[in-house]
Amino acid sequence: AGRFDGRVRVNVLEIAGGSDLAERFQQSGTATAAPGTVMVIDEGNAGHLKVSDAAYDTKVAGIVSGAGDVQAGLTLEQEGVLEGDLTVAIAGRVYAQCEAHSGSIQPGDLLTTSSVAGHCMKATERTLAAGAIIGKAMTGLKSGQGLVLVLVSLQ
């Protein structure tokens, strides 16, 4: 491990310690944001995120990294300016808390926020889904609640 102050340039960089691209954020609200929790932009606190609690929320921002023992591969932060305690995946593969009450989730399904706090669900209403997609399911969930591997690709 090391710390470099200044510019580092490489031709190829392979990261073998995780599989998502994350940023650190400050969290608003009192809800617990455990690994796998779906987060949305907090309109009342610039730059902060809060636990999602509404279906088809266009403020969807990412998923807290670390669920299913999959850690962030690369974490971005600007010390003293844009920093926080919550590591949130904004791209790549990460496990998310999902619910299948609106329909079973299959690999390839588009996912959006759910009314169940901190969870995502299968996007079945295409008109509501525009701008509210967090990514695509890579594993399934037939019923109930559980972890689903998600390819995060905000849309």
Where are each of the predicted segments found?
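Extracellular receptor-binding modules and their adjoining Ser/Thr/Gly/Asp/Asn-rich linkers
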Residues: 1-155
